[in-house]
Each structure stands twice: as C-alpha cells, then as structure tokens.
Amino acid sequence: MACLSWTFHSPSLRMATHAFVVLPEYPAQPQNTLILLHGLSGACDTWNRRTSIERYAQKHNLAVIMPEVQRSWYTDMVYGLPYFTFITDELPRLAANTLRVPVDPAHLYVGGLSMGGYGALKCVLTYPERYAGCISLSARCSVQNKLKLIENDPGQIREWQAILGEDLTVKPENDLYALLARIQKPAASPRFYVACGTEDFLYSESVEMAAALQQTFDHVEYEEWPGVHDWVFWDAAIPRGLISVLPREEKAE
C-alpha cells in the first residue's frame, strides 16, 4: 500500500488543507473508497498512527481517505468553515480527480469514531443515495446530550456557539434523528455497521441509534463487546466494520 500526506486547496474552505491517504499500489486499482473521519481530539493522520488501517485496507484493495476537519463536528459552522459541505460535496470530487479513486454511490463508504462516527452517520442520513455503506464506532449520536454536558464550561460553550450559533439551536440538519425521520425507505439501502464498547460512556447512544436505523434500513449490523472509548476498541472494530459493509465478493479470504 502507498501512504500519502495529501495537501490540496479546498475552494469551499478557501485555504489549503490536508488528508492522509492509503492507496493500493500500482498497478492495482482500488475497488472501493472509504472516507474515514477522525474524532474530536484527532487529526487526519490519527487513524493511521493508532490503528492498522493500512493493513486492513490492503486486504480489501480499498482506498482510504482521512481528511482534517479540526473540532468542527463535521458541520457547516455558523461562525466558521463549511466542513460538512467540504466532506460531502468537495472531497469526493477532488479525490476522484486527483487520486483516481472510485466515488460513485456503489463504491463510496464513510466511517468514523466518536465525533467522526457522528459525522459518518450525518453524511449517510443526509445523502443516503450517495453512499454504499457507513461504519459508526462509539459515535456521539445526540448533539443535545453533548450540550447538556457543557452547560458550565464557558470554553466549550463558545466552541459550540461557533458551530451552531449563539443560541445553540440544534437545527434538523445537525440532528441525526431528525435526518433519519425525513428518509423514505430507500430503493438502494446503504449498509450500516454500528459498534460500541459496553463500558463506553456513549454506549447507550449507539444502542439507540442502531435500533432506530433498523427501522428504516435493511442492512444494519450492531455489535458490542467489553471495551471503553479508546483505540484498543476501535482498532478491533474497524476491520469488523469493513467486513460487514463491503460487498462479499470483494472481501478477503
């Protein structure tokens, strides 16, 4: 596999930005592309530093693109940058043009952990027709729950005001359950893999989200096992997620 630090200009962000990329080496062409999203304290290279994602991608002849979004919660910020537009509209197009990877709906996947799990779910629930599958690990599934935890933290309140606005209103486009409620049962249903450790502080949110997804989508696999909110769990979960959502004919022996 080839590992690339990709620096490029983003028109939507109006600046240069970064992504870490894992690609099958020449002459192999990737069969699918995964946009893999970092958590709140992470960066574009964190998945590669903390897991064996390169080895897992090689088993599936998979291209993995890990973008940088700061602490934006994968949102078009009220007082900040349009990171959701960047992830959903711009990044796939730039990846196809520059890296020559497949980004059509049959071959594009998105996944992430914690804040990135929220971002991955938000991508697919906003645009279910654009993705073949979603991997959500230890996701924060309720922004409202997060806001309750920061009521006495001025620093985080300011951070969230930049994201949501001064009144901290969670609009439907940032509410996973509101997005899910809008969806009519799609003809081509994306596949979902949801996992969380049973000792994770976000455990109940993953359980509830998986149950809600199963009411709308045909292919939703939920797994749990003993674990907390850490890389031990996520390194074990990401290869299981790939096996769950990728087409069977393209999985490793």
Model-derived regions: residue spans:
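Non-catalytic cap/lid and distal C-terminal segments of serine-dependent acyl enzymes
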Residues: 1-253
